[in-house]
């Protein structure tokens, strides 16, 4: 029988890394798909996906289960996408292509 997200989260909070790895396997594709839809670039979407799971792992002790794990994970991913978009808008002029004279 497959463990639920809630069971895997509880085990992960108890220090079971294998349970967190199961959550990654379960949610990696949907999180990547979300990041790709928002950002539109494969490499950057992969980075956001990886950062999402890193942030989730670090914040897991504070996860109280008031929302579904998937909702919490999607919110982390969307916040990281928003941060990525903001950084792109603030790219320095030196990174922009020069006009041909």
State each model region's role.
Residues 33, 47-54, 67-79:
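Structural recognition of an alpha-helix C-terminal capping motif at a helix-to-coil junction
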Residues 20-22, 35, 64, 93-96:
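Short, hydrophobic secondary-structure boundary micro-motifs
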Residues 61-65, 75-95:
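Arg/Lys-rich amphipathic alpha helix in sigma70-family domain 2
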Residues 13-14, 40, 53-68, 87-88:
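Sigma70-family region 2
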């Amino acid at each position: 029988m497959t463990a639920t997200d809630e069971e895997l989260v509880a085990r992960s909070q108890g220090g079971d890394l294998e349970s967190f790895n199961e959550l990654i396997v379960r949610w990696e594709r949907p999180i990547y798909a979300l990041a790709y839809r928002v950002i539109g670039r494969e490499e950057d979407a992969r980075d956001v996906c990886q950062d999402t799971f890193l942030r989730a792992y670090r914040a897991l002790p504070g996860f109280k289960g008031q929302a579904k794990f998937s909702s919490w994970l999607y919110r982390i991913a969307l916040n990281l996408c928003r941060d990525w978009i903001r950084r792109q808008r603030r790219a320095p002029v030196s990174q922009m292509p020069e006009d041909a004279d």
